């Protein structure tokens, strides 16, 4: 018997560096530094993509969009998310809900969370009420606490198509 529900967990980290735009959850956030990465380095969307792919048993973002492929250089992570989600849907799953935590000293996430929620809901074709985003600090501990980078953790619940009640 195939399980009607699948849970995926995603995690990502990127360093904050000068000279890059800061994009989190598809939102451009005014800040003096941005995230370093092969694509736009959207730490939240990368963790979400991993959570969705993992729940569906489809690997991870690095397998689908390797950083060794020049085609993904500077890529918009919302485009990557939509492509990954198309594979998840093709595997027979839809999203029930997403719960995410963005961990950083600065900038503050809460003022930008509604726009992030709207982007994710639109990209996944789900109600905004099914997406939750929290911002947390580590009380000045570790690399996020020192402001050296941003981390994100995401849990996603998928439901197999045809199992709707």
From Swiss-Prot:
Catalysed transformations (reactions): 4-CDP-2-C-methyl-D-erythritol 2-phosphate = 2-C-methyl-D-erythritol 2,4-cyclic diphosphate + CMP
Gene3D superfamilies per UniProt: 2-C-methyl-D-erythritol 2,4-cyclodiphosphate synthase
Molecular function terms from GO: 2-C-methyl-D-erythritol 2,4-cyclodiphosphate synthase activity; metal ion binding
Entry's EC annotation: 4.6.1.12
Record note on cofactor: Binds 1 divalent metal cation per subunit.
Family: Belongs to the IspF family.
Source organism of the structure: Aromatoleum aromaticum (strain DSM 19018 / LMG 30748 / EbN1) (Azoarcus sp. (strain EbN1))
Cofactor(s) annotated in UniProt: a divalent metal cation
Gene name of the encoded protein: ispF
Subunit structure: Homotrimer.
InterPro entries: MECDP_synthase (IPR003526), MECDP_synthase_CS (IPR020555), MECDP_synthase_sf (IPR036571)
Name of one Pfam family that matches: YgbB
Name of protein: 2-C-methyl-D-erythritol 2,4-cyclodiphosphate synthase
Keyword Iron-sulfur part of the UniProt annotation: no
Site, Transition state stabilizer: residue positions: 38, 137
Keywords: Isoprene biosynthesis, Lyase, Metal-binding
Binding of 4-CDP-2-C-methyl-D-erythritol 2-phosphate, residues: 12-14, 38-39, 60-62, 65-69, 143, 146
GO annotation, biological process: isopentenyl diphosphate biosynthetic process, methylerythritol 4-phosphate pathway; terpenoid biosynthetic process
CDD domains: MECDP_synthase
Recorded metabolic or biological pathway in which this protein acts: Isoprenoid biosynthesis; isopentenyl diphosphate biosynthesis via DXP pathway; isopentenyl diphosphate from 1-deoxy-D-xylulose 5-phosphate: step 4/6
Chain's role: Involved in the biosynthesis of isopentenyl diphosphate (IPP) and dimethylallyl diphosphate (DMAPP), two major building blocks of isoprenoid compounds. Catalyzes the conversion of 4-diphosphocytidyl-2-C-methyl-D-erythritol 2-phosphate (CDP-ME2P) to 2-C-methyl-D-erythritol 2,4-cyclodiphosphate (ME-CPP) with a corresponding release of cytidine 5-monophosphate (CMP).
PROSITE patterns in UniProt: ISPF (PS01350)
């Amino acid at each position: 018997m195939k399980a009607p529900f699948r849970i995926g967990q995603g995690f990502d980290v990127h360093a904050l560096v000068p000279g890059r735009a800061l994009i989190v959850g598809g939102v451009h956030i005014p800040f003096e530094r941005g995230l370093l990465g092969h694509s736009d380095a959207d730490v939240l969307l990368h963790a979400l993509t991993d959570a969705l792919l993992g729940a569906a048993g489809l690997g991870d973002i690095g397998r689908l969009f390797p950083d060794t492929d020049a085609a993904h250089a500077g890529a918009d992570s919302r485009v990557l998310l939509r492509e990954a989600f198309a594979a998840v849907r093709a595997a027979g799953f839809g999203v029930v809900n997403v719960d995410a935590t963005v961990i950083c000293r600065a900038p503050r996430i809460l003022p930008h969370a509604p726009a992030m929620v709207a982007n994710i809901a639109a990209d996944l074709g789900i109600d905004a009420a099914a997406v939750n985003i929290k911002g947390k600090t580590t009380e000045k501990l570790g690399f996020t606490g020192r402001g050296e980078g941003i981390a994100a953790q995401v849990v996603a619940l998928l439901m197999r198509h045809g199992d709707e009640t």
